[in-house]
């Protein structure tokens, strides 16, 4: 090996342990992009870049998308597809999301003891898998109506890693918390391997139910998703009026989403329906008993402190007392101070999981900058705005859903609501039509986007988390498991936009539950 030529060594180092065919594919992408951009069409080069980036996300288990996606984004800036200034504009425009990832996810890490305590009790008390799935989906939906979906999914990931670690350490006979739970070589028997596979399938289904739950709840309120806030501000709605305007679509979708959760579990469809293995249940029960017996007064105080911080977290986020990232930072400060975590090394561990994804999301904003500079969505937006008022609602809903499933739904929602607001300000559509379009944009952005991990930041965070490889949750598997929800939520949402939105909005208006906001036909919509 010492005599290896330099070019071979470079190829071996390039993207590390990724397969050779994957390395060659990325190399071909980097070769083709400038040729297409300079000699064929910048527009189609932009679309090819979007497809390539989606490919890197799809191959996340072969190679973390930050490196190949980052190389593609860097090249896009170098050849002029976008500029560093535009990328920085996108990054600063989404600074709340980045701060959330840096501080909120780390804050949740310091509440792990309480979360594991609560969810272990929940898991061991509820024996019906359908009921447990319903509890996870419903709890995620409720929390996502008030908290950010990323925060909710970070909680569920933290709990799932805790459960997985407890059984893996038992099965591999590694007692300490420092044991490598990603290494299956130490599993002591074939029975443990089989049980672990079952447990992985069980955790996958719970996580997907929770992930979809964040979308079901997040679409309902103006604080549920970042783009909701942008849409609410543009339409002049407060918390209650936003909920009421959305309810003709979101309430039927929520009911059908919950029914889908029960049906896929009951009939064991699309990878759902796997029960918690008895061996794992016994290990978790033993762990729970052991922890209860060993719990010292200090441990009990830690749980109490974390519970109080949890209440602060929900209240602060629900009433938007500060930006999400700052609330996360306050959680870190209080949890570490009152639980006695003061060593730099111990605090640093909390940031390990979120930082790679934070970097990846920044790369994602570079791709969004290309979409803006090359105006990749402009033809679609122009086409929709030129159609008749009667067909605008369904077209806005469908095109929002399509674009949100391949791009950032915050970006798509922002672009569409700005275009709709401009059309209203220029007198092309009425105020009532603008409000209906705002509902179609919000629901279209949030509901069909569960189809792929690209559309929902919470799904992308789950896919690229340290948990995904542990439970064998790949891009393809996520798409398949999300499929029943995608079909039901998209179709029910579409039918509601088409048939119930207008009459129910009129009903709410006539009964003075909602009223037209005082929007002017001129000026910016800041």
From Swiss-Prot:
Topology with respect to the bilayer: Multi-pass membrane protein
Keywords: Antiport, Cell inner membrane, Cell membrane, Ion transport, Membrane, Sodium, Sodium transport, Transmembrane, Transmembrane helix, Transport
Domain of life assignment: Bacteria
Compartments (UniProt record): Cell inner membrane
InterPro entries: Na+/H+_antiporter_NhaB
Catalysed reaction equations from the record: 2 Na(+)(in) + 3 H(+)(out) = 2 Na(+)(out) + 3 H(+)(in)
Described purpose of this protein according to its UniProt entry: Na(+)/H(+) antiporter that extrudes sodium in exchange for external protons.
Pfam families: NhaB
Name of the protein described by the UniProt record: Na(+)/H(+) antiporter NhaB
The keyword Transport is annotated on this UniProt entry: yes
Gene this protein is translated from: nhaB
Membrane spanning residue stretches: 14-34, 63-83, 99-119, 122-142, 146-166, 206-226, 239-259, 307-327, 357-377, 451-471, 479-499
Family according to the record: Belongs to the NhaB Na(+)/H(+) (TC 2.A.34) antiporter family.
Keyword hit for Transport: yes
GO cellular component assignments: plasma membrane
Disulfide bonds: none
GO function terms (MF aspect): sodium:proton antiporter activity
């Amino acid at each position: 090996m010492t005599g290896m030529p330099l070019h071979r060594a470079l190829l071996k180092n390039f993207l590390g342990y990724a397969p050779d065919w994957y390395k060659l594919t990325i190399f071909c992408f980097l070769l083709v992009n400038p040729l297409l951009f300079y000699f064929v069409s910048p527009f189609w080069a932009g679309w090819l870049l979007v497809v390539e980036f989606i490919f890197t996300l799809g191959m996340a288990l072969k190679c973390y998308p930050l490196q190949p996606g980052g190389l593609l984004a860097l090249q896009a800036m170098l050849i002029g597809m976008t500029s560093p200034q535009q990328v920085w504009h996108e990054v600063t425009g989404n600074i709340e999301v980045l701060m959330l990832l840096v501080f909120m996810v780390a804050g949740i890490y310091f509440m792990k003891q309480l979360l594991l305590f609560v969810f272990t009790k929940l898991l061991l008390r509820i024996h019906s898998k359908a009921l447990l799935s319903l509890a996870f989906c419903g709890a995620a939906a409720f929390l996502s109506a008030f908290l950010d979906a990323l925060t909710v999914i970070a909680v569920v990931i933290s709990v799932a890693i805790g459960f997985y670690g407890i059984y893996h350490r038992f099965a591999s006979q590694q007692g300490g918390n420092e044991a490598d739970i990603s290494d299956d070589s130490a599993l002591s028997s074939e029975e443990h391997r089989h049980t672990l596979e079952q447990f992985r399938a069980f955790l996958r289904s719970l996580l997907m139910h929770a992930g979809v739950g964040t979308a079901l709840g997040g679409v309902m309120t103006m604080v549920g998703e970042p783009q909701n806030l942008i849409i609410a501000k543009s339409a002049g709605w407060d918390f209650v009026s936003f909920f009421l305007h959305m309810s003709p679509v979101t309430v039927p979708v929520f009911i059908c989403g919950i029914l889908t959760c029960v049906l896929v579990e009951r009939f064991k469809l699309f990878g759902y329906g796997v029960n918690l293995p008895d061996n794992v249940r016994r290990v978790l029960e033993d762990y729970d008993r052991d922890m209860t017996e060993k719990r010292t007064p200090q441990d009990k105080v830690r749980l109490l402190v974390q519970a109080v911080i949890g209440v602060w977290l929900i209240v602060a986020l629900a009433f938007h007392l500060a930006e999400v990232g700052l609330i996360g930072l306050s959680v870190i400060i209080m949890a570490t101070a009152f639980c006695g975590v003061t060593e730099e090394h111990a605090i640093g561990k909390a940031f390990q999981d979120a930082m790679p994804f934070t970097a990846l999301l920044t790369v994602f904003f570079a791709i969004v900058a290309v979409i803006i500079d090359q105006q990749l969505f402009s033809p679609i937006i122009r086409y929709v705005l030129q159609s008749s008022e009667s067909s605008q609602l369904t077209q806005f809903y469908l095109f929002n859903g399509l674009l949100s499933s391949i791009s950032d739904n915050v970006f798509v929602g922002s672009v569409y609501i700005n275009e709709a607001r401009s059309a209203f300000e220029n007198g092309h559509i009425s105020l009532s039509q603008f409000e209906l379009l705002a509902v179609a944009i919000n629901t279209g952005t949030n509901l069909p986007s569960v189809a792929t991990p690209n559309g929902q930041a919470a799904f992308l965070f789950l896919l690229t988390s340290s948990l995904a490889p542990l439970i064998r949750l790949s891009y393809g598997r996520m798409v398949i498991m999300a499929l029943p929800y995608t079909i039901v939520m998209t179709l029910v949402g579409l039918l509601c936009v088409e048939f119930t939105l207008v009459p129910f909005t009129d009903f709410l208006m006539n009964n003075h539950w909602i009223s037209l906001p005082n929007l002017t036909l001129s000026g910016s919509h800041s």
